[in-house]
Amino acid sequence: VAYFEKMKVKIASICFVGIVLIGLLILRQNLNGVIHKRNTMVCPDTRLEHKDEKNLPLIYGITSTYKRHVQIAELTRLSQTVMHVPMFHWLLTEDAHSKTSLVADFLNQSKLSYTHLFIKNNLTSGIVKDLNTRNNALHWIRKNVQPSTNAIIYFMDDDNTYSLRVFDEIRKTKRGSAWPVGLAGGLLHEGPIECKDGKAVRWNVHWWPQRTVPIDMAGFAVHVNVLFEKPTAEFTDRPDIESVFLESLGFNRDNIEVNYCKDVLAWHTQTKAPVIVE
Amino acid sequence: VAYFEKMKVKIASICFVGIVLIGLLILRQNLNGVIHKRNTMVCPDTRLEHKDEKNLPLIYGITSTYKRHVQIAELTRLSQTVMHVPMFHWLLTEDAHSKTSLVADFLNQSKLSYTHLFIKNNLTSGIVKDLNTRNNALHWIRKNVQPSTNAIIYFMDDDNTYSLRVFDEIRKTKRGSAWPVGLAGGLLHEGPIECKDGKAVRWNVHWWPQRTVPIDMAGFAVHVNVLFEKPTAEFTDRPDIESVFLESLGFNRDNIEVNYCKDVLAWHTQTKAPVIVE
């Protein structure tokens, strides 16, 4: 009997150790989950907060850039904006015959998720300065992104200013959406300024009021689905480049989504060329 | 005997449960520590990384700002820079008769640590546009900061561009330190361009080369201790405002600390005034 009782103690001991180990493993896994969640979520003063970051649609921010004295300053400033944005991939298209080491080194040090593209713009024969670089990014998306991907494209000039709140508007985009842009088209805010049920009921337009969708490049976003539905749509050499591009994707003032048009969330700022003597 | 053996099993059970609970408590506490650490440290893509954030010297970023079309755009962009900087307090001094609701609302929404000051600049009788606003911030520090505080002041114009790395240079400041500034004084980089053992051995200067410390406002930081040693030092209405201020605090080209002078970490960028028709 004593032998069996001793065995019972041993078995009980082994069972306990087993249960304890399993319990510890479960706890560890759960706590790891918490750590992981917190890592991506809890930087309240530094990032946009989202409950479930990985389920957010990806934003492809497309930026054309060209060599000039203020280039790295502009890219530094813009990178500090997009560093706050989760689920963001930066498509930087250089106006150059090959990647410059200046921009390559800058991107490499940035820790951002990015793709460095390059193509030479044709400045002598056109109205729009950065046609090739913009179309290069569209080409890259059509070649490298799955048509079923839940992703949205947004064109971000390197000298513009973007409120972090604009990225929330971008992520609401189902097919194509718009919002007002500050200091554009001769106005304090150009674009939709009154909206109802997701549509614009009033637009603020001064320059070329006949445009189909009168909005600055910083004032719209398009879901990649639409790019695959209209596989040849691209930017053309027109002064109303944004409107013509949106029209070629099937958008007009009535069907473009306008969820928010109260405050300005993006500004068409421009930087002075510095006077350098050396 | 069987009774005692049963008791043994019970005692063993209780002991195991107790040990398990203690183990779980210890594990929980340790993991909490990890979580807490990670919260403040691991946002590698969004913040400067510092091992022990709370022991860092505080940075007082001092920004003069005035009403104009691009004001909120500039403040938005600058706020996105300083949002990445730990242990930072923003002293924003408005050039106004009272706090404007535009700036107050902006700061209130920003989640930053800030103090909103105001004073009217006297634009009609001087060279320097923002003399009163700058001195107002110095006055606030001398009145509200303990002389023993480990804090450093840095003047950040709202249209300039700041690499996040400049804040590492600022925090090295023992009494007063300097670094080169991009696109300033007619040069691609003005200020110390060769340094050795914490001192500048060569300066790059074009405009007014006779200045005692030839550096732009974005190119120096001063420990608050020094402000209390020289309690009357302030900005005066001089074109070489930075140099005269640094001189009044006891600095010259030889005793100002220069730890790093290889890359440009701050740029004197300027924004174009937009053409608005309305």
Language-model region placement:
Chain A
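Active-site-proximal specificity loops/subdomain of glycosyltransferases
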Residues: 95-151
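C-terminal catalytic/acceptor-binding lobe
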Residues: 1-41, 216-278
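Short coil/turn segments at secondary-structure boundaries
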Residues: 30-31, 73-77, 103-106, 118-120, ...
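Short, well-formed alpha-helical segments that are part of the catalytic scaffolds
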Residues: 68-86, 98-106
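Phosphate/oxyanion-binding active-site loops and adjacent basic polyanion-contact surfaces
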Residues: 70-71, 126-134, 238, 242
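Conserved catalytic core of nucleotide-sugar-dependent glycosyltransferases
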Residues: 143-147, 154-156, 160-239, 272-277
